[in-house]
Amino acid sequence: MCVKRTDYCSSKNANSLKQQNYESYPKTMRVIADLHIHSRYSRATSQKMSIEEIARFARIKGLNLVGTGDFTHPKWLKEIQENLTFEPDTGLYKVAKNPELPVYFMTTTEVSTIFNFENDTKKIHHVILTPNIETAIQINDRLVKYGDLASDGRPTLNLDAPHLVEEIMQVSHENMIFPAHAWTPWFSIFGAFSGFNSIKECYQDMTRHIHALETGLSSDPPMNWRLSKLDKFTLVSNSDSHSFWPWRLGREANVFYLEKPSYREIVNAIRLKDKEKFKFTIETDPSYGKYHWTGHRNCHVALSSQDAIKLGNVCPVCRRKLTKGVEQRVEELADRPAGFKPKDAIDFVHLLPLSEVIATALNVNSPSVQQVWNIYNRLTEKFGNEYNVLLDASKEAMSHVTDEKIAEAIVRVREDRIKVVPGYDGVYGQPIIFDESAKEKLVSQRVQQLNLTDFM
């Protein structure tokens, strides 16, 4: 993948993107945006998740734009108002105490809707983008009728998806709403347990206001390209982060080339699928996601879609129903073969968080250990931020800052020359960078070397 003046492009990532010379866009800047995160008022979120900490680590990560998340929560909205200052003519905000920090904020939130549809209970998460705090307040005034906004940063609302869209659009047609993490088994539009089979089925006559779809960690653009009915929607990628740590924040993101960041430029680029402005998404390998394969965590069983189908989606150990993975769910809805790419598709690149790359190369269990931080800090201080390291820095230049094995690991990730043991049933996938045989060994361990035919 080429951005700016690099010459290391090769392998899958390089082939998935057209060669791009940053100098051919002399009046533009690269804007990397993570539009779906959470505040400390959301469940299972770091209590240190403040505006200042989000901005601090967004800069280190290389994010130019980050969503506020959770503007529906009264206490978080108050903190947004107190800690951010509006940037004129942008529809975006900066940190009031440090406006020189090169990080913009967009007012965003995620809501959960629970409703009945054809005698089934549907549970769908949606991301909402707004052009300013005033509009966010108007949205809150409408949504408070459907649920307790103070109960959670991501509130649960008792209304169906079409009426949610109607409420959002009645406030302003500048607002944007799209389904969150579209394929996860629970709380998603295509989820195996409480989702739909199409966007039209979910949003009904309000589908005309839906222009995008968030892929989530367990799927990537090629998986979504297999559904022809998704061609009209722009695929976006965000972290859904509940932490400011750089192995969570910005682990997936959207890359734009703009003269200046602005709400309208970003939203219009998404709505129009403008490939001149919306260049590509940053994705983790979908196998890294927690729900890529079908499986049962308690029994350490992880299965490909083919093997799960052979077993009737029943755990071969305990005989209980398996958690259907995203790979299998895509297979159920796909009407195209793997490898198909629509002609107007936004490009993508597979990456992993730099901390994860370093930890994997060092064979340590956590990206938070001091040894990883020491290398991470040296690289980001030298090259400016994490994305500069992952996307731009040459192997030779990195080798002057850290040992060659780390530099080689980063290049392999950049060029999509790694393997990942698939995640399943809430368990993250395991990246394999150097040991070519490790994936097969670990997959065998996860299915406990069972002979699947014994259970058919």
Residue ranges of model-derived segments:
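Extended substrate/RNA-proximal surfaces in nucleic-acid metabolism proteins
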Residues: 25-30, 77-211
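Cys/His-rich short segments
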Residues: 280-342
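An N-terminally biased module of ancient metal coordination in phosphate/nucleic-acid-related enzymes
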Residues: 8-12, 17-113, 118-121, 418-419, ...
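Histidine/acidic-residue-rich catalytic or RNA/ligand-binding cores of hydrolases
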Residues: 43-46, 77-81, 187-194, 225, ...
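Active-site environment of divalent metal-dependent phosphoester hydrolases
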Residues: 40-42, 68-77, 114, 135, ...
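Functional cores that coordinate and move charged inorganic groups
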Residues: 197-204, 213-293, 298-301
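Active-site neighborhood of phospho(di)ester-bond hydrolases with catalytic His/Asp-centered motifs
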Residues: 33-35, 66-70, 106-109, 178-180, ...
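Low-complexity, acidic/Ser/Thr- and charged residue-rich accessory regions of DNA metabolism proteins
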Residues: 358, 364-456
